[in-house]
């Protein structure tokens, strides 16, 4: 059975609804749907920019407004006006050639030397300038292909857009792997490789574990002198520290020099390289 609402509560609800609708209208908002049961009940409203969202009377009264409008207004506040942008470029002798939208949309500009440069204004404001003036020219397709050929690869591209783009190639030594990809940026720096060629750099004689691997010199020498020096020293003092008489965590030490210094001195006397 539905609970009957008293005349008092019904009147309060109607007053709240009227206040909410009036407040919405004052701020160019329209109530679309939803029953205003009380001040905490959310209803659907539309702002003057046709964004729809849900809000209750309590929050709207305290200043909560359309979230989409808030984001747009925030970005507009941060956006530099065109006169400010032009003056910043002019200070460095640059001329803007395309329409400025925002800091993160590409813009064309002409540097003091006459080079046309497409870039992000945000990078320019951080200090980045004309690539050609810095000598950072874009590779021609022929140069890009040569970079792959010089490494023993067969380039499979006839064009490219930028040096971070993954470009297709075949490895002459491992054709069976099929098409592989690497950016030109890494290829010219020797950072990109065929998958199998890369693995071969660390297998067989190239592996650190080849024929048992490489052991630490200090570890090898310590193990070598255990029977002839470490163990006899422990037995001499009945497996106790000569200073504290403790039997825990024992290590045999030289009084005058540590083991590392003795190793270096011995290798130096024998003319061995460390």
UniProtKB/Swiss-Prot annotation:
Matches recorded under InterPro entries: CapR_dom
Organism domain of life: Bacteria
Protein name, per record: SPbeta prophage-derived uncharacterized protein YomD
Organism encoding this protein: Bacillus subtilis (strain 168)
């Amino acid at each position: 059975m539905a609970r009957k609402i008293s005349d008092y509560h019904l009147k309060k609800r109607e007053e709240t609804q009227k206040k909410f609708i009036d407040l919405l209208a004052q701020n160019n908002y329209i109530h679309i749907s939803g029953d205003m049961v009380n001040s905490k009940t959310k209803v659907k409203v539309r702002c003057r920019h046709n964004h729809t969202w849900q809000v209750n009377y309590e929050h709207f009264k305290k200043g909560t407004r359309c979230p989409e409008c808030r984001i747009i207004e925030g970005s507009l506040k941060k956006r530099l006006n065109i006169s400010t942008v032009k003056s910043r470029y002019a200070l460095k002798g640059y001329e803007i050639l395309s329409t400025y939208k925002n800091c993160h949309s590409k813009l064309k500009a002409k540097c003091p030397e006459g080079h046309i440069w497409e870039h992000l204004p945000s990078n320019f404001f951080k200090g980045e300038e004309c690539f050609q003036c810095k000598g950072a020219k874009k590779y021609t397709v022929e140069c890009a292909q040569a970079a792959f050929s010089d490494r023993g690869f067969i380039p499979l591209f006839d064009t490219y857009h930028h040096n971070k783009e993954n470009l297709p190639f075949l490895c002459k030594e491992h054709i069976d792997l099929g098409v592989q990809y690497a950016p030109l940026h890494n290829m010219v720096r020797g950072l990109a490789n065929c998958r199998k060629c890369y693995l071969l750099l660390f297998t067989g004689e190239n592996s650190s574990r080849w024929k048992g691997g490489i052991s630490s010199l200090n570890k090898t020498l310590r193990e070598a002198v255990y029977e002839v020096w470490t163990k006899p020293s422990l037995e001499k003092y009945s497996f106790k520290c000569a200073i504290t008489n403790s039997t825990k965590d024992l290590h045999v030490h030289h009084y005058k020099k540590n083991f590392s210094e003795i190793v270096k001195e011995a290798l130096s006397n024998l003319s061995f390289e460390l």
